[in-house]
Amino acid sequence: MFDAKSFIEESVEDIKKQINGRKTIIALSGGVDSSVAAVLTGKAIGDQLLAVYVDTGLMRKNESNEIWNIFKEQMGLNLKIVEAKDLFLSELAGIDDPEQKRKIIGRIFIEVFEKVAKEQGEEILVQGTIAPDWIESEGQIKTHHNIALPSGMVLEVVEPLRDLYKDEVRKLATELGLPEKIAHRQPFPGPGLAVRILGEITEEKLEICKEANFIVSEEIEKTGLQKELWQYFAAVLDTKATGVKGDIRDYNWVVALRFVKSLDAMTAHTPEIPFDLIKRISKRITSEIPNVTRVVLDVTDKPPATIEFE
């Protein structure tokens, strides 16, 4: 049985020893993993910690504002937001291979942190890596952005959660007093919406993905189903389909819906979702996002599929 209180006590001491008085940056995404890592590190080293949130442009709708309100205004963390959308999108232009996209995001992600670290005199980078991240990477299922570190990286990495699974991290979040919204937030991939946009990432597909995911989250959370689901999201497929808008033929993008249940992300299954809810989500997406003509439902378990599309 996982003892959250004991883990916190031991981790705080371990982090103190690892960091040993050095100035430290944490990669804060607002997900439960990085949030718990931030609080643990803060308990260990206090004001030596600088929480850095990189706005890659690949995040959820309104994410930067929510991060600021929760972590700066409510929790009082020493928080710096780095606007890097243009940098990420320019580097990703023309790239359609999923592994290339992940590696580019990982490289830029670390480079941005290194730049801030040099400016602030930081030496340590804390990451919220958990067990499924490195297990999948070692098994070559997919590369996770927060462990595909470039050679010659200047910062030393500390990963206080690397042996834990998501359910254990959520228990830690509750024990640490994190807001319910963070403690039980659905997992969000490190590379952001990049793994929910198949093929090349364009501004058009990115905006579709943001709006579609916002609609899915809003509708699921209205019903309370988020408490039963591991993840619920939309992906933009790299294909178009014929539709009709008004009396006019339209040839535009296809959005896929995905709902899964899981305990630790190593396996997952597709539950039955009320069909009227699926229809409502589909209708909202096709009516509120002009350049989407079709919505489909992915019912594939993991394995054989992974949870995210890329």
Swiss-Prot record:
HAMAP family per UniProt: GMP_synthase_B
Enzyme class: ligase
InterPro entries in alphabetical order: GMP_synth_C, GMP_synthase_B, GMPS_ATP_PPase_dom, NAD/GMP_synthase, Rossmann-like_a/b/a_fold
Domain GMPS ATP-PPase: 2-185
Gene3D superfamilies noted in UniProt: 3.30.300.10, HUPs
Subunit structure: Heterodimer composed of a glutamine amidotransferase subunit (A) and a GMP-binding subunit (B).
GO cellular component: cytosol
Domain of life: Archaea
Signal sequence residues: none
The protein's role, per its UniProt record: Catalyzes the synthesis of GMP from XMP.
Gene: guaAB
One Pfam family cited in the UniProt record for this chain: GMP_synt_C
PROSITE patterns xrefs: GMPS_ATP_PPASE
Residues spanning the membrane: none
Gene Ontology molecular-function annotations: ATP binding; GMP synthase activity
Keywords for this protein: ATP-binding, GMP biosynthesis, Ligase, Nucleotide-binding, Purine biosynthesis
Known pathway: Purine metabolism; GMP biosynthesis; GMP from XMP (L-Gln route): step 1/1
Protein name: GMP synthase [glutamine-hydrolyzing] subunit B
Residues noted as binding ATP in the record, renumbered to the chain: 29-35
Catalytic reaction(s) noted: XMP + L-glutamine + ATP + H2O = GMP + L-glutamate + AMP + diphosphate + 2 H(+)
CDD domains assigned: GMP_synthase_C
EC number: 6.3.5.2
